[in-house]
C-alpha cells in the first residue's frame, strides 16, 4: 500500500485497540489497520499467540504494540489504557473482538460457572473497554472515536449457539445501541458487525473439552438445512477498516451490520 493509499483511509497515525488481536479475525483486523498506517495495540490472553503475531506482522506498516492481558480483570484493563495513554495519548478506534464460545448448553443444563465466564468475556469486558475508550476519546480537544463490536448471528437468533453465548451477543447489541445513542452526538460512533460463519478463526478450540450433545445437534440441523456461505477474515477486516475511517462511513452509528453472505436473513 502506497503512502497516498494509507492517508486515504484516514487511519494513518491514529491509535487503535484490537482485543483478541493475536489470532483469527483480530489478527486480520490488526494487519489491515497496520497497512493503513495506524498505531495498533493488540491485547490477547494467549502469550504464545501474541509472540507469533508480533513476528508475523512487525514488518508491516504502522506501529504494532502487543500486551498480554485478561480483559475480564479490571486492573489489567486499566493498566492497558494507562499504557496506551503513555505511548500514544488518546485512543481513536476500539474493536471489541475477543470472545469465547459456550458448549451449546440450553438454559436447563447450563452451569453457572460457564455462564459467568462467557458473560464476563463477551459482554462485561466490552463494557469496561468501551468505558475507558469513551473517556479517552472525549478527552480530545475535538472529541471523536469509533467503537466496533464484533457480534454474531446469535445476537439476533436463538438457535445458533447455547444460552450463554446467545445472551452475551444479544447483550452486546444493547451495549452497542446504548453507546451509539448517548455518545453519537458527542462525536463517538458505535456499531456492531453481525457475523456469520468465518474461516480462519480459532472457534473450534472452544469444543476441545466437549459440548452439549442435543444443543449442538440442534445447531447442526440449522446449518445443514441452510448451508451458509463462509466469510473470510480478511474480507471482514476490510469492512472494519472502512467502518473505522472510510469515506461516507462517518454517518453510520448504532447500526447492526450483517457480514454473513445473507445468513441472518434466513435464520435471524
Curated annotation (Swiss-Prot):
Its EC number is 1.1.1.-. Keywords: NADP, Oxidoreductase. Pathway: Secondary metabolite biosynthesis; terpenoid biosynthesis. One of its GO terms (molecular function) is oxidoreductase activity. Pfam families: adh_short. GO terms for biological process: terpenoid biosynthetic process. Belongs to the short-chain dehydrogenases/reductases (SDR) family. Coiled coil: none annotated. Diterpenoid pyrones display various biological activities and higginsianin A shows anti-HIV activity. InterPro entries: NAD(P)-bd_dom_sf, Sc_DH/Rdtase_CS, SDR_fam. NADP(+) binds at residues 18, 70, 97, 131, 165, 169. It comes from Colletotrichum higginsianum (strain IMI 349063). Short chain dehydrogenase/reductase; part of the gene cluster that mediates the biosynthesis of the diterpenoid pyrones higginsianins A and B. The first step of the pathway is the synthesis of the alpha-pyrone moiety by the polyketide synthase dpchA via condensation of one acetyl-CoA starter unit with 3 malonyl-CoA units and 2 methylations. The alpha-pyrone is then combined with geranylgeranyl pyrophosphate (GGPP) formed by the GGPP synthase dpchD through the action of the prenyltransferase dpchC to yield a linear alpha-pyrone diterpenoid. The active site is at residues 165, 169. This is Short chain dehydrogenase/reductase dpchG. The keyword NADP applies.
